[in-house]
Swiss-Prot record:
UniProt keyword annotations, A-Z: Cell cycle, Cell division, Cell inner membrane, Cell membrane, Cell shape, Cell wall biogenesis/degradation, Magnesium, Membrane, Metal-binding, Peptidoglycan synthesis, Transferase, Transmembrane, Transmembrane helix
EC class of the enzyme, as a word: transferase
Biological function: Catalyzes the initial step of the lipid cycle reactions in the biosynthesis of the cell wall peptidoglycan: transfers peptidoglycan precursor phospho-MurNAc-pentapeptide from UDP-MurNAc-pentapeptide onto the lipid carrier undecaprenyl phosphate, yielding undecaprenyl-pyrophosphoryl-MurNAc-pentapeptide, known as lipid I.
Full protein name: Phospho-N-acetylmuramoyl-pentapeptide-transferase
Native species: Pasteurella multocida (strain Pm70)
Gene, per the UniProt record: mraY
Pfam family, one: MraY_sig1
RNA-binding listed as a keyword: no
Associated pathway: Cell wall biogenesis; peptidoglycan biosynthesis
Cofactor(s) in the UniProt record: Mg(2+)
GO cellular component: plasma membrane
Length: 360
């Protein structure tokens, strides 16, 4: 929005041209989202406490979690508000990729909001009926997928980028829609499963979003895209602003979510952030990098799949409890140790992912 204001004011003072620089707007988007999140955080927490929107805890979970019962949840609303405000202020709103990203973010946030609200009002951890939850997640993902395909059909925006192989970039055709669906829905649920400890999900989300900001910038720059042997996608540069807004809002939320947490993001936050990472990965054509950089999310999801599959087939559990962060808790690891070690692993995986951009 302010891009247009800057363009208008340039005729009166050339210094306003600085607003046109993507790097400047990215930094300002990060700071705006951070400050908005820090500003509204205490207000949101107080409001959630007054409404008695407290977290419900699994009865079969670690005993250390019983003390978390009643901690305000649905704090993800402040993350979404900060990201949306910052993106609308600093992104070029004529860019369709910005709107696809906001559509998935807010659409998944709405589903998460309903899910959280049902858990709170029913005083259990069930929430939305699974089939309806996945139905609406699928509807939003498919609407976004068809729209993205319509814009990028038969261009580099619908090619598959394979790590380590610069010559292998097949045109996906309609398979692009299927891949987009699974990436968005899968990432959303993976982040949701990871959000089980104080700050566990938000820091990997911040790290991956920060990495995607760099990738989006390179993908939207014809010279860097050619240098890295990745597709040049003209609309992708504006995603830098969206990604840095996620970083800022995430860090602001972590201020209140760090152990011991004053507020939890709830499904309204985790589903939305996961969906946002998924749609960005698709738009910059780096789905494989998302698997690498978001390795913590992948492992958490696989631990649940393996646990359920093993129990159904062999009536035996692989882990003491799934997702895997609970397994380490039941082994005696203090919660902060689990959290920080997962953060370190996430940072390492993000760096590995960024390195693979050049290893082609």
């Amino acid at each position: 929005m302010l891009v247009w204001l800057g363009e208008f004011l340039q005729q009166y003072y050339s210094g306003f041209n600085v607003i046109s620089y993507i790097t400047v707007r990215a930094i300002l988007a990060l700071l705006t989202a951070l400050l908005v999140s820090l500003w509204i955080g205490p207000k949101v927490i107080r409001r959630l406490q007054l409404l008695k929107f407290g977290q419900e805890v699994r009865h079969d979970g670690p005993e250390s979690h019983f003390s978390k019962r009643g901690t305000p949840t649905m704090g993800g609303v402040m993350i979404l508000f900060a990201i949306t405000v910052s993106t609308l202020l600093w992104a070029n709103l004529a860019n369709p990729y910005v709107w696809f990203s906001l559509f998935v973010l807010l659409g998944y946030g709405a589903i998460g909001f309903v899910d959280d609200y049902r858990k709170i009002t029913r005083k259990n951890t069930d929430g939305l009926i699974a089939r309806w939850k996945y139905f609406w997640l699928s509807v939003i993902a498919l609407v976004a997928a068809f729209g993205m395909y319509a814009i990028g059909k038969d261009t580099d925006a619908t090619r598959l980028v394979v790590p380590f192989f610069k010559e292998i970039m097949p045109q996906l055709g309609l398979f692009y829609i299927i891949l987009t669906y699974f990436v968005i829905v899968g990432t959303s649920n993976a982040v949701n499963l990871t959000d089980g400890l104080d700050g566990l999900a938000i820091m990997p989300t911040v790290l991956v979003a920060g990495a995607f900001a760099l990738i989006a910038w390179a993908t939207g720059n014809v010279n860097f895209a050619e240098y890295l042997h990745i597709p040049y996608i003209k609309f992708s540069a504006e995603l830098v602003v969206f990604c840095t807004a996620i970083v800022g809002a995430g860090l602001g939320f972590l201020w209140f979510n760090t152990y011991p947490a004053q507020v939890f993001m709830g499904d309204v936050g985790s589903l939305a952030l996961g969906g946002a990472l998924g749609v960005v990965a698709v738009l910059v054509r780096q789905e494989f990098l998302l698997v690498i950089m978001g390795g913590v999310f992948v492992v958490e999801t696989l631990s649940v799949i393996l646990q359920v599959g093993s129990y159904k087939l062999r009536k035996q559990r692989i882990f003491r409890m799934a997702p895997i962060h609970h397994h380490f808790e039941l082994k005696g690891w203090p919660e902060p140790r689990v959290i920080v070690r997962f953060w370190i692993i996430s940072l390492m995986l993000v760096l590995v992912g960024l390195v693979t951009l050049k290893l082609r």
